[in-house]
A protein has these predicted regions:
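Catalytic center-proximal scaffold of phosphoryl-transfer enzymes
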Residues: 1-141
Length: 141
């Protein structure tokens, strides 16, 4: 509400803003459905999730992308319940590129690949905290 007022100078009630959001959601539903079907046909999908706080509670932004098309979903959970509710991964049969979270490995109809960015982050932590030579060499690969 405050953002709309700051941008437009109009003061809208929360109910009015919520109505606009719901109308927009309904109008975009067929586009989202088509986008999901397109992603399901791709040979590889990258997935990740990141937490953020809303009214003192953690919410999770789940991202599914093929590099050209990205869908984002907000869910109060991070793991299996969110994956099931979103419904893309349970239907996906290609290669899932992920951060190695246990919740992804329940789905054996797809193959799994560790995300390179997450791997580099882990190696950096190992080098910084322990100075292991093998981790430093792995980062150079």
């Amino acid at each position: 509400v405050a953002l709309v007022q700051a941008i437009s100078g109009l003061r809208l009630s929360e109910a009015t803003c919520l109505g606009y959001v719901r109308s927009l959601h309904d109008a975009l539903q067929s586009w989202e459905d088509a986008a999901i079907e397109r992603l399901l046909e791709r040979p590889a999908l990258h997935v990740d999730e990141t937490g953020f706080r809303v009214d003192g509670k953690t919410q999770w932004l789940h991202v599914v992308t093929d590099g050209a098309l990205t869908l984002k979903f907000v869910h109060p959970k991070r793991g299996g319940e969110a994956i099931e509710d979103i419904g893309i991964i349970p239907r996906y049969a290609g290669t899932l590129v992920d951060d190695c979270r246990e919740a992804y490995f329940v789905y054996d109809q797809c193959s799994h690949q560790l995300c390179g960015s997450h791997l580099l982050r882990e190696l950096t932590f190992i080098v910084d905290s322990n100075g292991f030579r093998w981790a430093r060499l792995m980062k150079k690969l």
